[in-house]
Amino acid sequence: NIARASSIYGKEMRSLFGCGEGMVQLGFDFSSLEARIQGHYILPFNGDDLAEQLLASKPNDIHSLNAKKLGIPRDQAKSVSYALMYGAAYKKLKKMLGLADEQAKALFDAYWDAVEPLKNLRDAVGSSWEARGKSFVVGVDGRKIVTRSKHSLLNALFQSGGVICAKYATVFIYQLLEEQGYKCNPFKEKTIDMCGMIEYHDEC
């Protein structure tokens, strides 16, 4: 990953990448990639409404709606959502928000009740992982995603889904360019018209 331009040394890091004279540098990123991956997985668990909320704009987005349900500010609801979705226990909420044990436990339970399709997905993925010897989950394209522990299953599923989609997109772009007559493969051509420079997070 590369720091955003506004982060410390972010601009300097990004300035390391560029193209030669007479060439043009192009870039793209994916729109709400992680939310779309989540939506894909929760749909079979009666997740139609939740999937729409994942892609909605304020004030109808998932974090705004969760904030109302949980009775906390939107920025806290967003932090809670990502923390719990990626395996945090209630003690993490206690530390993050400065809550007492009982408050943190209540918020933990309230969050999962508010996102029932995601909760059902979490449980189903956990059962699948256990049935496979606690070693892997099945990725969006059928590959094995080796996991560290049960609490990281959703993280592994969603993050791998985004990476897989980005890799497929890159392959498709190369295929389309070659169909248009561009030379892209240095192992087939003496000179090439374009090449990949870098992929990071959900940007190329």
What residue ranges belong to the model's regions?
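Short alpha-helical scaffolding segments that buttress acidic/His motifs in well-ordered protein cores
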Residues: 77-85, 107-111, 158
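Short coil/loop linkers at secondary-structure junctions
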Residues: 72-73, 99-100, 183
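Amphipathic, charged-and-aliphatic alpha-helical interface segments
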Residues: 70-88, 176
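Short alpha-helix boundary/capping elements
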Residues: 45, 88-89
